[in-house]
């Protein structure tokens, strides 16, 4: 099947993927043929489909494509016939989903190809959280421990503090056994000891911030949903929702060194917090007066919202601008949906931002900025982990 080349933007489409993935129950890489010529070209990925229902026999087909890797100006543009993915459109009329979240919204804005695969065609990676990379496992265990501690003590901060100090080792070990088995491997024993020490200190500081500021815990992993103009139904799950004087306060937990989120706040790019704030204010009919990232390994709370809470472990960050991130995201949602309905899916990781139509239109359309590559701020970021690299014709 030939693809129609209609331009030179950084948009890349594979018709066979959208035609066949909807029929697939399981997908296996069979072969990957790489050719090297004047330009480096990847070509001829074969996938094996195990089909549902009556069509149960194995089928092998070739996904033929031609993608130049390297020089962005030679990147070809492909368009897909809307009829080819009619099954998906029937299930999600106009690519509309029943409900969106921060994760799906951000994926649509930053990596539309992954949005279509993950959220429309349900092509997902079902790897167990307990067997993820070590830092992801640490984050999962930390989240689970705080959630368990909150519910076990009826959201009472004093009781949480007492149990945390008296029974931390026993309780966190139970969480590790069920959600962090990777930490129990022999080669990770020193890592686990450091992790437990960091987590104990971090939760102690967290509970002290809550206690000294006289905050009430509304819920851990608190869920809310509401209708948002310009998007539709939206859902949020907040790591820790608190309240003071009838005003809401949001803590989002991160298990890393915090530089990423420090920069997000400095550059006013903390879309996750903006999404949570807008969903909660409408769903709960209360003002959200404080949102912050709590960096667990550093036991540091980063925020834009000065003067609401006080503690030596709270760091106030001044943003570079006062852009309304949520309104930008709504505009970007509409922009990306229109692209999808016109058969255009951007797959432009590592390419110069200045060459992308999205970037060109960003000022006039007031769009949310694209993430930049960690090694080159003038290029588009790659998706962490590249879960669909084979489908996009990249090497394993």
Predicted regions and their residues:
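A signal for specific C-terminal beta-sheet/loop modules enriched in small/flexible residues
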Residues: 1, 47-61, 130-132, 284-288
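Generic structural signal for alpha-helix starts
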Residues: 1, 43-44, 101, 266
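C-terminal accessory regions
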Residues: 3-54, 342-360
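RecB-family 4Fe-4S metal-dependent nuclease core
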Residues: 30, 37, 70-396
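Helicase C-terminal subdomain and adjacent C-terminal extension
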Residues: 41-84
């Amino acid at each position: 099947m030939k693809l129609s080349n209609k331009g030179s933007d950084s948009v890349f489409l594979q018709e066979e993927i959208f035609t066949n993935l909807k029929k697939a129950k399981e997908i296996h890489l069979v072969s990957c043929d790489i050719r090297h010529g004047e330009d480096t070209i990847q070509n001829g990925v074969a996938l094996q489909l195990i089909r549902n229902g009556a069509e149960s026999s194995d089928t092998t087909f070739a996904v033929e494509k031609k993608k130049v890797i390297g020089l962005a100006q030679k990147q070809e543009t492909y368009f897909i016939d809307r009829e080819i993915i009619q099954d998906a459109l029937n299930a999600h009329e106009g690519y509309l989903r029943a409900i969106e979240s921060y994760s799906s919204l951000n994926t649509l804005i930053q990596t539309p190809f992954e949005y279509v695969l993950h959220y429309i065609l349900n092509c997902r990676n079902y790897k167990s959280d307990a067997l993820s990379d070590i830092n992801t496992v640490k984050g999962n265990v930390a989240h689970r421990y705080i959630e368990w501690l909150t519910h076990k003590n009826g959201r009472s901060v004093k009781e949480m503090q007492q149990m945390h100090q008296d029974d931390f080792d026993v309780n966190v070990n139970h969480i590790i056994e069920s959600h962090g088995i990777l930490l129990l491997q022999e080669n990770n024993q020193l890592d686990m000891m450091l992790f437990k020490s960091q987590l104990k200190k971090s939760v102690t500081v967290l509970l002290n911030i809550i206690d000294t500021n006289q905050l009430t815990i509304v819920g851990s992993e608190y869920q809310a949903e509401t209708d948002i103009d310009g998007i539709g139904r939206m859902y949020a799950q907040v790591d820790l929702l608190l309240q003071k004087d009838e005003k809401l306060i949001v803590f989002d937990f991160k298990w890393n060194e915090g530089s990423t989120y420090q920069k997000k706040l400095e550059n006013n790019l903390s879309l996750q917090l903006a999404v949570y704030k807008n969903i909660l204010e409408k769903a709960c009919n209360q003002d959200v007066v404080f949102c912050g990232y709590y960096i667990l390994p550093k036991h540091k709370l980063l925020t834009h919202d000065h003067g609401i809470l006080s503690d030596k472990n709270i760091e106030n960050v001044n943003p570079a601008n006062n852009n309304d991130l949520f309104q930008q995201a709504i505009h970007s949602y509409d922009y990306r949906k229109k692209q999808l309905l016109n058969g255009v899916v951007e797959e432009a990781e590592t390419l110069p931002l200045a060459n992308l139509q999205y970037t060109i239109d960003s000022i006039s359309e007031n769009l949310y900025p694209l993430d930049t590559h960690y090694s080159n701020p003038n290029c588009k970021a790659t998706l962490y982990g590249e879960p669909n690299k084979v489908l996009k014709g990249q090497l394993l």
